[in-house]
Design a protein with these regions (language model features):
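Glycine- and acidic-residue-biased ligand/ion/polar-headgroup-sensing regions
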Residues: 36-62
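C-terminal amphipathic alpha-helical segment
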Residues: 1-38
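A generic structural signal for well-ordered coil/turn residues at beta-strand boundaries
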Residues: 28-30, 45-46, 68
Length: 98
């Protein structure tokens, strides 16, 4: 087990990325912390899983609702917009190995 030893990198207004490949021997995956009242979750080249920790609201122009403990499987190259009633806190992870 390795505790995160780095602060992460802010890649957008709502997303902080934790890429262990920069400081660790772990090179299998990247984790992103998503926060905010509204915003966009950028597409990545890999399928991903996102877990909502807090907040509720709508995604994809109101087509999908979210609330704490929801788990979403996201296809590669999928951009998600969100509008939260209270601040969203979610984590997305994806493997960078093919």
């Amino acid at each position: 087990i390795e505790q995160t030893k780095f602060p992460g990198k802010i890649i957008s207004e709502n997303i902080k990325q934790f890429d262990p490949r920069q400081v660790s021997s772990i090179d299998d995956f990247i984790v992103e912390e998503i926060q905010g009242q509204q915003g966009t979750i950028n597409a990545v080249d890999y399928p991903s899983i996102m877990i909502v920790v807090q907040g509720d609201g709508l995604m994809n122009q109101g087509k999908t609702s979210f609330q704490p403990a929801n788990v979403f499987l996201i296809d590669k190259q999928t951009t998600i917009d969100f509008q939260a009633n209270s601040n969203l806190l979610a984590y997305r992870a994806y493997s960078v190995l093919l």
